[in-house]
Amino acid sequence: MFTGIITGVGRISAVQALGESTTHGKRLTIEAPVGYLDDVGLGDSIALNGACMTVTTFSVEKGEFTIDISAESLDKTSGLDNEGPVNLEKALRAHDRLGGHIVSGHVDGIGHVTRFEQVGESWDLRVMAPPALGKYLAY
């Protein structure tokens, strides 16, 4: 579980194919901020741009970790298939403060942005979600 609050910004520094086909997914290497991986272990969950991923290797010394992402997850997310910046959030622990919301980080469907407009110092964002997901949305 996650709060949905970004705790660091990393950088996807390498993208490798898993297998000979794009249907096998990809392995991403992520450079993390200094000290970010100090309490991370193999198999821990870290959300990348809000999507829950599993740490497959990590190096505190190098400040980087890898995740293997399936073709399905690549299809249902954005910003995870090319090198560049990525938002990071470590999974909650039982004793952590809930400073945001409780979210799973699991993708249940794809929405489409229908409006993105600045209103004063805020932004009005409207997303059209598949009807089957309506029962899970608060609005």
Positions of PLM-derived features:
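Conserved loop->alpha-helix
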Residues: 1-139
